[in-house]
Structure formats: C-alpha cells, structure tokens
C-alpha cells in the first residue's frame, strides 16, 4: 500500500525496526567487522574488550563523519545551501564527538588506583555527556543560522551530485545508528547509545534537507531556511535526550529488576539463608558494580557456621555476576511461637494499611508491662500516605489488636526501584 511504501522510506521506521529479519544482514556484517578488528570480541564483560569496542567505534565514527563533512561542505558551497552546510558542520561536530568518545573509553579502561579505588569507569558517562552537550550547542548554532536564512533568503543552485551526496549520507547515517546501537547494547555503553541517538537525529535532519532541496528543484519554493530550523530542532531534542540517558547513571539510578532478581536468587540458593533485604547497588561504570544487602539467618544457628554461609553467598555472587558484594548477617528468631505470632500479626496489620508496604528487621523487647515490637517498614517512593501517617495507622492498629504491644517503627526506602 501507499502507507507501507511511505513508512519503509522513512529512516526512523527503518532504524527502529533494526531487529526485523530483513535487518539481519547488517548485524551479521557488523559481527564480521567486530571479529576482524576486535580481539576476543565475544567477551564483552572483560574491561579490556570493552575498551577495544570503544576505540573501534570511535575510529569508525571519525572516518565516516569526516567523509560526510567533506562531501556535504562541497555540496553546500556549490548549491549555496545553508541547510546543507549546517548539516556538514553537524557531521564535523560528530567527528569531534567520536574523538571524545574514543578518549573516554581509553580513560575509563584505566585500572583502579590510590586516588580512584573504584576505577575510572564513570569517565565513559562523562564523555557521553560531553557528546550530548556538543550536540545541543551545534543545534542552537544551526537554529541561529537558519533563522538568518529565512530573513535573508538566497537562491539555490541544485545539482545531481548534491542530491546523491544527501541520499548516500542518509544511508551511511542509518548504518552508523545501527552500528552504534548494536555495539552499545553489546557492551552496555551509554556513550555509544548517545552516539546512536545522534546518528538517528542526523538521518532525520538530512532527510529534511533533502526534501527542501527537492522542492527547490521541482518548484520555485525555497524552504532552505525552514528546513534548517527543522534540522536544528531535531538536533537539539536528540542532544537533550542523550544527555538525560548519560546523566542518569551519574546521578544514581536503581538497578534493573532482572539484576535484583538474579542476585537475590543466588543468595537465597542456600537454604540456611531465609530472606534478604536492604539491597543497595552502586554503579561506578560498566563492569564496576558494588552491592550490599542484609541476609536473614536463624538466630539459633552457630555464628561461625552462619558466617561461612554468608561468605559462600558473597563468592557465588562475585563469580556469577562479576559484582563486588558485602553481606550483613541479620539473625531472625524462628523457633519462638510468641514472636512468630507477633510477626505474622504485624505483617497483616502493615498489609492492611497498604498492600505495597513490607517489613523487615522484626524483633521484640519484652518489659514488665509493655512489649515493644521494633521493625522497619519498607515504603515506596511517592506513596500516597506520608511517613508519619503510615506510622500512626500501624501503631494504632497494633495496639487495638494487642493492647500490651507498642510499635517502634523505622521507615525505610527501597534503593532498587
């Protein structure tokens, strides 16, 4: 149908559907390049291999963008098109961004030292943010130039060679978007994903320039300045999107649900560990993840024996997930009927206040007249009740059920999203 043809000609549609069967040839070609130029290319968890990926992607980006810059600047001068020349300068900035990415990967691959005991992995995020900043600045420069062209339009001299250059540029940027997205997913690189976003915006931008040139060729309509504005807006939006993606790991974001589930499953694989909570994950760059959690063990277990089980759990996590972890041992009374009854009652009360709420670190302190139930309540972020309201409701309901009990509550937040 006409809609189907139009969709397939759309570069955004083409790139976003890179996982379709017809895109397999491109992936196979990229894998062949990786196999040819990157030693041990399949060992993507190895920091040295990740550095090789970054260097390779940077070199490819520099070469491709310099070729596009030279071709477009010639076409822009010949046609007197501000949008083509703006697109050329955009490619030159992309070449500079590739250099920044390359340097970032080299620095991020440096081993840990006295001043940086957690390594240099976050430099990769910083380089990605620099790339994003360069994209945004270039976008505003293009916007200024394009507005001037709208106010003071000049005639265009369209040639077949300029059209060919623009079409080939779109095709090359399509491939570069796929290339960087594929590599970024393989090694989980924010910098490469930012570069892929930039290439995608370049596809859209050059497509708009091409449409403007074609309109000039087949009619008297000159939308060169307007096309330049559209290009600039696409570039600016792409820059802000890439900046957001690279800032999130720097500011601190929760681990994925898959990561949390896998880690908890590995720890709970030992039947002597009966629960886990207070998981905190720190990301110091790809391949540099540090975690800590509290593991619950029966209080009547021998302390040295429990310590051995905790040590073995730490080694399992470090071996399988390449994650440095420190586990705190929490003793839990499991063989006292009174405490078990009070724990079940407390859980039921907390769930009646909010199904999303949960408890941990439950213990009791019995006095001559009052028994204190001491526990933490895990509350989601942006919960509809305030911390004080949650405490008051739980304390009131517990006292109503067990008049001799008082709830001593600590509100806790999840660090895993």
Stretches with model-predicted labels:
Residues 1-5:
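Short, small-residue-biased leader/transition segments that mark boundaries at the very start
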Residues 14, 19-54, 245-417:
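Peripheral (non-transmembrane) domains and long loops of multi-pass membrane proteins
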């Amino acid at each position: 149908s006409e809609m189907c043809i139009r969709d397939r000609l759309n570069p955004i549609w083409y790139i976003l559907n890179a996982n379709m069967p017809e895109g397999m040839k491109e992936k196979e070609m990229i894998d062949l390049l990786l196999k040819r130029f990157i030693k041990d290319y399949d060992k993507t968890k190895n920091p040295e291999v990740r550095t090789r990926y970054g260097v390779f992607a940077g070199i490819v980006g520099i070469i491709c963008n310099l070729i596009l810059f030279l071709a477009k600047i010639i076409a822009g001068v010949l046609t007197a098109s501000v949008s083509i020349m703006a697109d050329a300068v955009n490619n030159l900035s992309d070449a500079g961004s590739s250099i920044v990415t390359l340097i970032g990967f080299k620095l991020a691959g440096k081993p840990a030292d006295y001043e940086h005991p957690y390594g240099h992995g976050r430099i990769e995020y910083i380089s990605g943010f620099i790339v994003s900043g360069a994209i945004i600045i270039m976008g505003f420069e293009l916007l200024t130039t394009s507005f001037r062209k709208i106010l003071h339009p000049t005639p265009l001299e369209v040639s077949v060679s300029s059209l060919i250059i623009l079409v080939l540029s779109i095709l090359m940027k399509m491939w570069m978007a796929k290339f960087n997205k594929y590599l970024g997913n393989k090694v989980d690189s924010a910098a490469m994903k930012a570069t892929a976003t930039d290439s995608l915006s370049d596809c859209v931008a050059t497509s708009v320039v091409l449409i403007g040139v074609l309109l000039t060729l087949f009619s008297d309509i000159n939308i060169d300045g307007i096309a330049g504005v559209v290009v600039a807006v696409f570039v600016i939006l792409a820059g802000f999107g890439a900046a957001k993606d690279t800032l999130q790991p720097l500011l601190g974001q929760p681990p994925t649900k898959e990561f949390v589930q896998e880690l908890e499953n590995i720890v709970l694989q030992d039947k002597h560990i009966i629960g886990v909570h207070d998981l905190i994950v720190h990301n110091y760059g790809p391949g540099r993840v540090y975690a800590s959690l509290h593991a619950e063990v029966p209080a009547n277990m021998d302390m040295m024996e429990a310590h051995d089980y905790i040590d073995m759990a730490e080694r399992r996590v470090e071996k399988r997930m390449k994650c440095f972890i420190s586990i705190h041992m929490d003793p839990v009374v499991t063989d006292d009927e009174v405490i078990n009854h009070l724990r079940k009652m407390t859980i039921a009360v907390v769930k009646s206040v909010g199904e999303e709420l949960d408890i941990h670190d439950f213990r009791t302190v019995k006095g001559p007249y009052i028994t204190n139930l001491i526990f933490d309540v895990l509350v989601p972020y942006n919960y509809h009740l305030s911390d004080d309201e949650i405490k008051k409701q739980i304390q009131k309901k517990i006292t109503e059920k067990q008049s001799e009990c008082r709830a001593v509550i600590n509100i806790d937040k999840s660090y895993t999203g």
